[in-house]
From Swiss-Prot:
InterPro entries: KOW, Rib_uL2_dom2, Ribosomal_uL24, Ribosomal_uL24_CS, Ribosomal_uL24_KOW, Translation_prot_SH3-like_sf. Part of the 50S ribosomal subunit. CDD domains: KOW_RPL26 (cd06089). This is Large ribosomal subunit protein uL24. Gene3D superfamilies: 2.30.30.30. The keyword Transmembrane helix does not apply. Keywords: Ribonucleoprotein, Ribosomal protein, RNA-binding, rRNA-binding. The gene is rplX. Belongs to the universal ribosomal protein uL24 family. One of two assembly initiator proteins, it binds directly to the 5'-end of the 23S rRNA, where it nucleates assembly of the 50S subunit. One of the proteins that surrounds the polypeptide exit tunnel on the outside of the subunit. GO terms for molecular function: rRNA binding; structural constituent of ribosome.
């Protein structure tokens, strides 16, 4: 009997969360720094404020209304961003450590700065 294809969505572990400050390390916006607006774990992508801006031409919806050109951020792959320390202005990889209370937190490898409070 053939097995059914698994149609449940896969969630990938992302190293960034909504609200993190990141630096783009690859692509046309390389070097730009911005805040993560939204994380999309099913696609392994993130939306970063001010990065990967796309223009969309919107048709008029009602009679008498004129069309518009809307600019908005498009998702970029999470592997193309790196966490950024605003205190020391440096991008760093992330590692996971435990606090004295036993809570698992994210820590920047270069600076030792703890991200999760």
């Amino acid at each position: 009997m053939p097995s059914k294809k698994d149609t449940t969505p896969k969630f990938h572990k992302l190293h960034v969360k909504t609200g993190d400050t990141v630096q783009v390390i690859a692509g046309k916006d390389k070097g730009k720094v911005g805040e993560v607006i939204k994380a999309l774990p099913q696609l392994s992508k993130v939306i970063v404020k001010g990065v990967n801006i796309k223009t969309k031409h919107v048709k008029p919806q009602q009679e008498g209304e004129s069309g518009r050109i809307v600019t908005q951020e498009a998702p970029i792959h999470s592997s193309n961003v790196m966490l950024y320390s605003t205190k020391q202005n440096v991008a760093s990889r992330v590692c996971y450590t435990f606090t004295a209370e036993g809570k698992k937190v994210r820590k920047l490898k270069k600076t030792g700065e703890i991200l999760d409070n």
